Regions:
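Bacterial N-terminal signal peptides that target proteins for export
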Residues: 2-11
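Bacterial N-terminal signal peptides
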Residues: 10-20
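N-terminal leader/targeting pre-sequences
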Residues: 24-203
């Protein structure tokens, strides 16, 4: 029975790799894959693309993100997320990506971006309330939860105004440092919700 289950799991992973040609694994263990345009940005940014390479480096991973086909000279916010589309689940702010005059941006992030990427809250504890004037104010207490694996990526406009300037919807979302970002632009919904690309990176 165990051998059968082990074989089935291996076959499932192999099938996933065959069916998703956007993911490639190199001899050095690095994994390369694409991000796709989010549903809310498909009409206004149909040519937006993202390309990600994650390279294991001992105790951490190095993640290089290249985005193109975006508005020029614009700031975007990059997150590791539980699922690629709404409601997104647990989300972890990584940093910003700024585009140049040609709508292209690149940033390198160093951290834990692999099958071991997770968040956990063993218990509730008071949290500082710093940003509390917007539509998504800080919570003053966290809910406890067991480990949640987070294997997807998402990119958001840094502000609703920037999104509207690009002809996109002006919805306000919490995905920036002040919790008043614009809509999601790119994500990894080309992978299953429970098998995001980070799951295929092994430290």
């Amino acid at each position: 029975m165990f051998k059968h289950l082990q074989f089935s799991a291996t076959a499932a992973v192999s099938l996933l790799l065959v069916l998703n040609p956007l993911l490639a694994t190199a001899k050095d263990g690095s994994v390369t894959f694409d991000m796709v345009v989010s549903g809310g940005a498909r009409a206004c940014l149909p040519n937006a693309t993202g390309h990600v390479t994650i390279t294991p480096a001992g105790p951490v991973e190095i993640m290089d993100v290249v985005v193109e086909g975006l508005p020029p000279n614009t700031e975007f916010d990059f997150f590791v997320i539980q699922v690629p589309k709404a409601p997104f689940g647990v989300s972890w702010y990584q940093g910003d990506i700024e585009t140049n005059a040609h709508g292209r941006g690149h940033e390198r992030f160093v951290g834990r971006f692999s099958i071991e990427t997770f968040a956990v809250a063993p218990g509730s504890a008071p949290a500082p309330v710093v940003f509390n004037n917007g539509p998504f104010p800080d919570a003053s207490l966290n809910p406890p939860f067991n480990p949640i694996q987070m294997y997807h990526l998402g990119l958001w406009f840094g502000s609703p105004q920037a999104a509207q300037a690009a002809g996109c919807p002006g919805n306000v979302t919490p995905f920036n440092g002040d919790h008043n970002a614009g809509i999601q632009v790119l994500n990894t919904s080309n992978f299953p919700d429970d098998f995001g690309p980070l799951r295929q990176v092994h430290p």
